[in-house]
């Protein structure tokens, strides 16, 4: 039995991937709820800031986590360095989201509301990355 890591792509256990997906959704929804309270109370963001409404944030969270879980599974199957590529994808997602936040500022949205939304995005990307790479790690199959 070989103890060397294979450079070949691996796979993810489906149950662990579903567990990572569930943990991500619960953690992000809870953090979004907490950050919504902070955004409204501490930063005095307006109540009509649509990103803070659960009927908007929860479906978007589900879509983002499902997309990330799919990407994680595909990267594990086709890439020899899935965690690195997943990290790069998370960085691009956050950067593009911040650029889109500038559009929200251009429509005269509350600056502190947009900052709170940006914090939500960073927390969400971090939770997804850690859940996928720690709960559903890559299993490498080596041939002897």
Region annotations inferred by a language model:
Residues 1-15:
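Short, Lys/Arg-rich, polar N-terminal cytosolic tail immediately upstream
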Residues 17, 73, 77-95:
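Internal alpha-helical transmembrane segments of multi-pass membrane proteins
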Residues 60-78:
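Canonical alpha-helical transmembrane segments
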Residues 32-56:
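Membrane-helix boundary elements
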Residues 35-43, 72, 76, 80, ...:
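Membrane-water interface at transmembrane helix exits
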């Amino acid at each position: 039995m070989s103890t060397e890591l294979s450079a070949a792509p691996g796979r993810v256990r489906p149950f662990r991937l579903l567990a990572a997906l569930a943990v991500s959704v619960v953690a992000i929804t809870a953090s979004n709820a907490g950050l919504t309270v902070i955004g409204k109370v501490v930063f005095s963001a307006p109540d009509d800031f649509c990103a803070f409404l659960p009927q908007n944030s929860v479906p978007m969270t589900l879509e983002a986590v499902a997309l990330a879980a799919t990407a994680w599974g595909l990267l594990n199957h086709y890439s020899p360095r899935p965690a690195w590529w997943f990290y790069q994808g998370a960085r691009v997602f956050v950067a593009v989201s911040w650029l889109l936040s500038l559009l929200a500022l251009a429509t005269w949205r509350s600056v502190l509301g947009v900052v709170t939304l940006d914090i939500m995005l960073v927390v969400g990307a971090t939770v997804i990355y850690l859940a996928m790479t720690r709960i559903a790690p890559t299993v490498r199959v080596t041939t002897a």
